[in-house]
């Protein structure tokens, strides 16, 4: 297919762009295969470059010969274009709708993007499973790297290499895979160096109504236990939902078959419920006419902060089991690709200082989301504005980033990255020039040959010139476990995501810049103090030598 076939009117003059907190701009609107561009001849006017893949929905209005297109973006931005001529407006709208909903992944911008920067590090090879295993290999002698899934034949949503107990061979893993939803047999998610306890993750067991069992599965997770120790199975579903799953062939671990494990059920809502929550929240944030009571009522009705509280509570429980009770845990919901990954990731941020650094967090995203099979292509296909909702779209990853932001806000000195880093990840998960978030799992990414045909997001982020934008000036390495508060009073609406297009950030930006300047000045003064102390110590040493007989 040629993009030209979808572009009926490639260029329109005298188009007026309206954006909140910016003066209206008149210019020329151009459509390309992947971008909507508005360019003005006025001096000091910023051009608009908008990826078609970032467009969630459009509305059309007409007043006489003037047409208006309202573009609603996946990053929650709303842009208005006033276009002279009804035919031109209809053609532009038709092209935008077609170009923003391309069916083929290989027609998306990452396959056409050519970087203008020097690639210092190939991000596709920055966080390979073998490299991550090397970090633990000296301390986890009871574990091994298995390539049982190298052809993606055992589990289509797992990567080729996974970490499993050394006592379990590949034949046993194949049998366990037939007992777990989607073939997602239990694998290592995190090893707690402090006491050797682990977090494992999987899909639900396929016990069904007949109480089916799998001795290889029991042996696998029991291999993670120390003598005389019990473990915890954290099921992210309420008990009634887990019981209903048995009628569909799913279920949960029976106590009779797993006597050394205590099962705990939590109440994290499934992904389709989260989508409605996001729609309500964004709708409320965009309503500028409501009074305080109505705003607070609509915010509460969205249940967004309730979802955050439940996810963080479950992550804290997992971290507590590991760190304070010295118990290993297995985490799963139904598929093991959504709420499971939220909990395993957040538990690691609480427990592991490395996950709070920029590269450590990138490794976490790569390991616990991309390689672990979170279906980004489905979940991030649309955002909060699209009318034709599919059942698989859901802000699971955005909720995770929001939870991270809540912890970052409570521990502002313990994270090497800042809020802008989290916002950037949100934006690129929904629309990007990079191939990192394309596809639903490693199997799909291999078939698409993303490593050969697209650029990794990490290749761009990890350049020194970009890293400076995402570095937290308050960061001081903290090797302790951090315990976030999940009290309702401690959780806040993430204004940097949900209100950034509805209020000016000018004064916040100025305050942030001033804070950075103060910190840099303080470092300079500290360096001078240290220099003077060294000089004083040298002078005192010289005086002591001269006074000695």
UniProtKB/Swiss-Prot annotation:
<feature type="coiled-coil region">
    <location>
        <begin position="508"/>
        <end position="542"/>
    </location>
</feature>
<feature type="domain" description="GRAM">
    <location>
        <begin position="4"/>
        <end position="99"/>
    </location>
</feature>
<feature type="modified residue" description="Phosphoserine">
    <location>
        <position position="548"/>
    </location>
</feature>
<keyword id="KW-0175">Coiled coil</keyword>
<feature type="modified residue" description="N-acetylmethionine">
    <location>
        <position position="1"/>
    </location>
</feature>
<dbReference type="GO" id="GO:0019903">
    <property type="term" value="F:protein phosphatase binding"/>
</dbReference>
<dbReference type="Pfam" id="PF21098">
    <property type="entry name" value="PH-GRAM_MTMR6-like"/>
</dbReference>
<comment type="similarity">
    <text>Belongs to the protein-tyrosine phosphatase family. Non-receptor class myotubularin subfamily.</text>
</comment>
<dbReference type="InterPro" id="IPR029021">
    <property type="entry name" value="Prot-tyrosine_phosphatase-like"/>
</dbReference>
<dbReference type="GO" id="GO:0010507">
    <property type="term" value="P:negative regulation of autophagy"/>
</dbReference>
<keyword id="KW-0007">Acetylation</keyword>
<dbReference type="GO" id="GO:0046856">
    <property type="term" value="P:phosphatidylinositol dephosphorylation"/>
</dbReference>
<keyword id="KW-0963">Cytoplasm</keyword>
<comment type="subunit">
    <text>Homodimer. Heterodimer (via C-terminus) with lipid phosphatase MTMR6 (via C-terminus). Heterodimer (via coiled coil domain) with lipid phosphatase MTMR7 (via C-terminus). Heterodimer with lipid phosphatase MTMR8.</text>
</comment>
<keyword id="KW-0966">Cell projection</keyword>
<keyword id="KW-1003">Cell membrane</keyword>
<dbReference type="GO" id="GO:0005737">
    <property type="term" value="C:cytoplasm"/>
</dbReference>
<dbReference type="GO" id="GO:0048471">
    <property type="term" value="C:perinuclear region of cytoplasm"/>
</dbReference>
<protein>
    <recommendedName>
        <fullName>Myotubularin-related protein 9</fullName>
    </recommendedName>
</protein>
<dbReference type="InterPro" id="IPR030564">
    <property type="entry name" value="Myotubularin"/>
</dbReference>
<feature type="domain" description="Myotubularin phosphatase">
    <location>
        <begin position="123"/>
        <end position="498"/>
    </location>
</feature>
<dbReference type="GO" id="GO:0005783">
    <property type="term" value="C:endoplasmic reticulum"/>
</dbReference>
<comment type="function">
    <text>Acts as an adapter for myotubularin-related phosphatases. Increases lipid phosphatase MTMR6 catalytic activity, specifically towards phosphatidylinositol 3,5-bisphosphate, and MTMR6 binding affinity for phosphorylated phosphatidylinositols. Positively regulates lipid phosphatase MTMR7 catalytic activity. Increases MTMR8 catalytic activity towards phosphatidylinositol 3-phosphate. The formation of the MTMR6-MTMR9 complex, stabilizes both MTMR6 and MTMR9 protein levels. Stabilizes MTMR8 protein levels.</text>
</comment>
<dbReference type="InterPro" id="IPR010569">
    <property type="entry name" value="Myotubularin-like_Pase_dom"/>
</dbReference>
<dbReference type="InterPro" id="IPR011993">
    <property type="entry name" value="PH-like_dom_sf"/>
</dbReference>
<dbReference type="GO" id="GO:0032587">
    <property type="term" value="C:ruffle membrane"/>
</dbReference>
<dbReference type="Pfam" id="PF06602">
    <property type="entry name" value="Myotub-related"/>
</dbReference>
<keyword id="KW-0597">Phosphoprotein</keyword>
<keyword id="KW-0472">Membrane</keyword>
<keyword id="KW-0256">Endoplasmic reticulum</keyword>
């Amino acid at each position: 297919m040629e993009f030209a076939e979808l572009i009926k009117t490639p260029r329109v003059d005298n188009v007026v762009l309206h954006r909140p907190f910016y003066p209206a701009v008149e210019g020329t609107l151009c459509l390309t295969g992947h971008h909507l561009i508005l360019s003005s001849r006025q001096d000091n006017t910023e051009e608009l470059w908008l990826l078609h893949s970032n467009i969630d929905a459009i509305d059309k209005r007409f007043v006489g010969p003037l047409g208006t297109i309202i573009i609603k973006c996946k990053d929650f931005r709303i842009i208005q274009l006033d276009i002279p001529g009804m035919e031109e407006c209809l053609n532009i709208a038709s092209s935008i709708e077609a170009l923003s909903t391309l069916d083929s992944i290989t027609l998306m911008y990452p396959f056409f993007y050519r970087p203008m920067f020097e690639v210092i590090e190939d991000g596709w090879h920055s966080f390979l499973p073998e490299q991550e295993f090397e970090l633990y290999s000296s301390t986890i002698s009871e574990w091994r790297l298995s390539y049982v899934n190298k052809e993606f034949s055992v589990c289509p949503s797992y990567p080729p290499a996974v970490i499993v107990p050394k006592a379990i061979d590949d034949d046993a893993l194949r049998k366990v895979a037939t007992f777990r939803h989607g073939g997602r047999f239990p694998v290592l998610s995190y090893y707690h160096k402090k006491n050797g306890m682990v977090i494992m993750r999987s899909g639900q067991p396929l016990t069904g109504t007949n109480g089916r069992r799998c001795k290889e599965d029991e042996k696998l997770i029991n291999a993670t236990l120390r003598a005389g120790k019990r473990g915890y199975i954290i099921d992210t579903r309420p008990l009634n939902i887990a019981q209903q799953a048995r009628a569909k062939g799913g279920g949960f671990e029976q106590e009779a078959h797993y006597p050394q494990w205590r099962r705990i059920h939590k109440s994290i809502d499934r992904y389709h419920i989260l989508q409605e929550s996001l729609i309500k929240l964004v709708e409320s944030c965009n309503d500028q006419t409501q009074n305080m009571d109505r705003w607070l009522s609509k915010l509460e009705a969205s249940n967004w902060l309730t979802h955050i509280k439940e996810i963080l509570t479950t992550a804290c429980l997992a971290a507590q089991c590991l760190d304070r009770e010295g118990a290993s845990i297995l985490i799963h919901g139904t598929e093991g690709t959504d709420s499971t990954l939220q909990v395993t990731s957040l538990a690691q941020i609480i427990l592991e200082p490395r996950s709070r650094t920029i590269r450590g967090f990138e490794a976490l995203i790569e390991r616990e989301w991309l390689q672990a099979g979170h279906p980004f292509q489905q979940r991030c296909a649309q955002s909060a504005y699209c009318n034709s909702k599919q059942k698989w779209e859901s802000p699971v990853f955005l909720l995770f980033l929001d939870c991270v932001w809540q912890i970052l806000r409570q521990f502002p000195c313990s994270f090497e990255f800042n809020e802008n880093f989290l916002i950037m990840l949100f934006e690129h998960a929904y629309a990007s020039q990079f191939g990192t978030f394309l596809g639903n799992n490693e199997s799909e990414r291999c078939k698409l040959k993303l490593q050969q045909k697209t650029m990794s997001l990490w290749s761009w982020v990890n350049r020194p010139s970009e890293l400076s934008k995402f570095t937290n000036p308050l960061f001081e390495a903290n090797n302790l476990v951090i315990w976030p508060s999940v009290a309702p009073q401690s959780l806040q609406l993430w204004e940097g995501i949900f209100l950034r297009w509805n209020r000016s950030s000018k004064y916040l930006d100025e305050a942030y810049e001033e804070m950075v300047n103060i910190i840099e000045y303080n470092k300079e003064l500290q360096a001078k103090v240290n220099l003077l102390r060294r000089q004083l110590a040298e002078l005192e040493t010289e005086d002591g030598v001269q006074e000695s007989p």
